[in-house]
Structures are given as structure tokens and as C-alpha cells.
């Protein structure tokens, strides 16, 4: 009986800790913590041949102008889990033709940042988050090159913020 009571207490204790953690991750305190940025500038120019061994790329390239993208982030809650992950991981950037509009691509990312700049459990899931960081940085010709200064500031901030969250979660595991 004592062993059973102890196991029940332990289970309840861990459930309470998980709930407290969820509240903390969604709090302004955590948002401020992962928003702390040092002034070091990171310059990254990805090499596609290195990425080829990590990422299965679709040989067929698409033009971003061929897609309807007006309210993609607001409509994403209606997607099934697999499509939701694909959309928010941004791995679809690898299928875009580099001649696609940089302005449209940057506008899509800017809209995503406006909708999701704070932690959201399903969107900031480690698998989705790590793929998103890889996709955004690796496709810098579309996501960053020739962008306006305000966009670059917003982009750099969210990359660093997501990276800080990723580091926190890796340290925790």
C-alpha cells in the first residue's frame, strides 16, 4: 500500500511540475529570457552540398508565386498534424526555385514571426523548431538577402530567440 501511495504521489508531483513548466514557457518571463541577445554578429553562408547529406531535397523546384499565401498562418490550425509540421518547419523552402520572389518569401516569414514570435507548444516543438532554423538559414538567398533593415532585425531576433529556446531544451534533456 505504501509503495502504491508513493508512486501515485510521484506521478501527481511530476504532472504538477509539467503544468508549472507549461505555464512558465508561455509566460512573459520566459519570453524575456530567450529574447536576450548578445551583440555578436553571426554570418552564415550555407553550402548546399553539405546540406544534401542531411536533407532529402525534392528535385522539382516550385515558384512561390504559384501558391496562395494570404492567410496561411491563420488557416494552419485546420491542418492535420503532418501538414502542420511541414508548414511550420519551413522545409518546403528547399523546394522553391531560387528565382522565386525574395520579397514574397520574406513577407511569409515576417507574417509567421508576427503570429508566432512567442513560445507556442506545438509550433515551438523541438523537431519543428530545429528544422525551421535550418530551413531559414540554409535558404538565406530567399529568406534574408536584399531584405529591408527592419525585416533583418526582426529575422535575426527570432532566429536567436528560437536558438536560445532550443539550447534551453537541449540542456534540460
Give residue spans per PLM region:
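Extreme N-terminal leader/anchor segments
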Residues: 1-74
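Generic alpha-helix detector with strongest preference for long hydrophobic helices that associate
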Residues: 1, 5, 73-77, 113-117, ...
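Aromatic-lined, polymer-binding surfaces characteristic
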Residues: 81-173
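Acidic-enriched, low-complexity/disordered segments with a strong bias for Aspartate over Glutamate
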Residues: 38-39, 58, 66, 75, ...
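Short charge-dense sequence patches
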Residues: 37-45, 54-64, 79-91, 112-113, ...
Amino acid at each position: 500500500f505504501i509503495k502504491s501511495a508513493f508512486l501515485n504521489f510521484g506521478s501527481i508531483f511530476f504532472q504538477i511540475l509539467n503544468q508549472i513548466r507549461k505555464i512558465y514557457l508561455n509566460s512573459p518571463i520566459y519570453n524575456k529570457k530567450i529574447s536576450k541577445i548578445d551583440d555578436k554578429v553571426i554570418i552564415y553562408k550555407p553550402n548546399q552540398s553539405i546540406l544534401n547529406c542531411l536533407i532529402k531535397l525534392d528535385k522539382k523546384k516550385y515558384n512561390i508565386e504559384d501558391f496562395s499565401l494570404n492567410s496561411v498562418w491563420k488557416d494552419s490550425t485546420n491542418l492535420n498534424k503532418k501538414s502542420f509540421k511541414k508548414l511550420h518547419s519551413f522545409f518546403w523552402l528547399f523546394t522553391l526555385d531560387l528565382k522565386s520572389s525574395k520579397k514574397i518569401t520574406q513577407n511569409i516569414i515576417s507574417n509567421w514571426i508576427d503570429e508566432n514570435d512567442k513560445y507556442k507548444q506545438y509550433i515551438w516543438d523541438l523537431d519543428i523548431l530545429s528544422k525551421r532554423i535550418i530551413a531559414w538559414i540554409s535558404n538565406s538567398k530567399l529568406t534574408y538577402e536584399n531584405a529591408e533593415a527592419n525585416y533583418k532585425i526582426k529575422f535575426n531576433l527570432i532566429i536567436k530567440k528560437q536558438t536560445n529556446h532550443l539550447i534551453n531544451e537541449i540542456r534540460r534533456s
